[in-house]
Amino acid sequence: MSSPTLNRKIGGHVSIAGGLTNAVQNTLDIKGNCMQIFAGSPRMWLRTPFPEDQVTSFNLKVKEQDLSPIFIHALYLVNLASDNPELLEKSYQALLMDLQNGQRINSAGVIVHIGSHQGRGFDSVKDQIISLVKKLLKNTKDTPFLIENSAGQKGKIGSLEEIEALVKSIDDPRIKVCLDSAHMFEAGIDLREAKVVEDLVKKLGTKGLLDRLVCLHLNDSKTVLGSGHDKHENIGEGEIGKAGLSNLVNHPKLKHLPLLLEVPGQDKKGPDQKNIQTVHTLTN
């Protein structure tokens, strides 16, 4: 039976536990048609090249099932704004490997939380971030580097203004943007109001970010508008609600974007078929 949303790319963050190719079956199990993965443990610094046999098998299966685009989410430990040289080097090496692995699986990008300036202010760390990202791009090929917005937590870098400053200064076609619906709401952008979404899209255009926006993290928020706390909820079960998320995903200038879910899931095991089905009912 055909569906008007069949062509919309909707997927979720899936596990590669047991091997890279398992991400394909995990995506099919939740009825996704695109995916996001970690290229290793999300809470360990160690990053290694994907085994060649797994890469070959994965690429073949992805093509067979038409499961693209594929995004890699960087380590949560990464902090390009740190004043700790050891942490900076670990962050750089982890991102370097993610970008290299991304190129081997034709990834549409590595999604990165830039990190925290730990009270020192964005202006004091901006040049350091720019220098490190430029170095990463110089030493890798093809794979885009996606900056994700923050939820407005104290010290965390990722407001639209900060992303704009980084994008303009780095000035590289591989620099792209990922926006998270829960983070926007938690940072004070009320997606429940259609006019606010319209103003957001205009703002993205003015800041030169709309053309660099390549995907949306579609998550409901467990916390209230402007909370500054990053807590995701299942689609339609949080403070944003179905109507608010619908405002976002159906905006004419956003409706081509892949939607990646990072929700708890009905059984607390992550994105599931029910959440993806709910998103299909929101899209038109």
Walk through the language-model features, giving the residues of each.
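N-terminal pre-domain/capping segments
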Residues: 1-72, 78, 82-97
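Conserved active-site loop/cleft motifs that coordinate metal ions or position small ligands
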Residues: 36, 214-217, 256-263
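Active-site acidic/histidine proton-transfer and metal-coordination neighborhood
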Residues: 64, 80-177
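Short, electropositive alpha-helical surface patch
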Residues: 86-98, 122-135, 160-169, 196-202, ...
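Acidic/histidine-rich catalytic cores of soluble enzymes
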Residues: 35, 133-233
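Acidic (Asp/Glu)-rich catalytic clusters
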Residues: 5, 25-31, 51-71, 96-106, ...
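Conserved, mostly hydrophobic/aromatic
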Residues: 27, 73, 91, 102, ...
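Active-site beta-loop-alpha junctions enriched in small/polar residues
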Residues: 13-17, 40-42, 74-77, 115-117, ...
